[in-house]
């Protein structure tokens, strides 16, 4: 086994981004700077939930990854499947212990979200559209968790709406990208069930709904630091139009949405910090 595989299988860059979104949810909801120790705990709970979910996902997805992503740790033999499973369970356990430090509401929320990540990887992922929506719900739950961690929801709900919509779009694009491998293994993803073209239309609809939803925070007085969201909207529009015209561009489109999400996180953070309370 390769020691670096234990880091790689977590996909830390994705988990760091998720942790930042959790912190952002707390900042937006708190209308100020929450206690630093709470922000650290929120980040860690989200990080370990994300990393555990990624690890368990690779455990269940090993056959598909042999075709679609052969360079991932398990298919290339860098870590055994059994070791990956127990490693994922360990990460869940660490995250839940940390969640207890935030209180029972935060613990129960984390427990529910963690359970959903496991069930998604185990049973829900192959189901057409249901799997996509589940991932989007988990992503939307991230800023809400940050808000729960500081004891209020407030504006974090708007961030959750945007996160949900853009991730439904991205998950469908990823399924279009993985069409051949999924079809060979008998998966029942949305593109396989209704075709790439119709799936591209649905992905683009959710993309444009994200753009519309991105204006909701303006209505409630988010700060001028939110202006970079214009760049995000342009990127989402491009990805949505591309996949609408040519579904074969879904792979490029989902990467654009991933980068756009990163910029959106920064935009929401700056907007929250520059808002007049």
UniProtKB/Swiss-Prot annotation:
Q: Which residues cross the membrane?
A: 16-36, 40-60, 93-113, 129-149, 153-173, 199-218, 222-244, 253-273
Catalyzed reaction equations: sn-3-O-(geranylgeranyl)glycerol 1-phosphate + (2E,6E,10E)-geranylgeranyl diphosphate = 2,3-bis-O-(geranylgeranyl)-sn-glycerol 1-phosphate + diphosphate
User: What pathway does this protein act in?
Assistant: Membrane lipid metabolism; glycerophospholipid metabolism
Q: How does it sit in the membrane?
A: Multi-pass membrane protein
Give a GO biological-process term.
glycerophospholipid biosynthetic process
Q: Per its UniProt record, what InterPro entries does this chain match?
A: DGGGP_synth, Prenyltransferase_related, UbiA_prenyltransferase, UbiA_sf
The cellular location(s) given in this protein's UniProt record come to: Cell membrane
One Pfam entry name: UbiA
| Family note | Belongs to the UbiA prenyltransferase family. DGGGP synthase subfamily.
* Role noted for this protein: Prenyltransferase that catalyzes the transfer of the geranylgeranyl moiety of geranylgeranyl diphosphate (GGPP) to the C2 hydroxyl of (S)-3-O-geranylgeranylglyceryl phosphate (GGGP). This reaction is the second ether-bond-formation step in the biosynthesis of archaeal membrane lipids.
Q: Report the HAMAP family cross-referenced here.
A: DGGGP_synth
This protein is called Digeranylgeranylglyceryl phosphate synthase
User: Which source organism?
Assistant: Pyrococcus horikoshii (strain ATCC 700860 / DSM 12428 / JCM 9974 / NBRC 100139 / OT-3)
Lineage per the UniProt record:
Archaea, Methanobacteriati, Methanobacteriota, Thermococci, Thermococcales
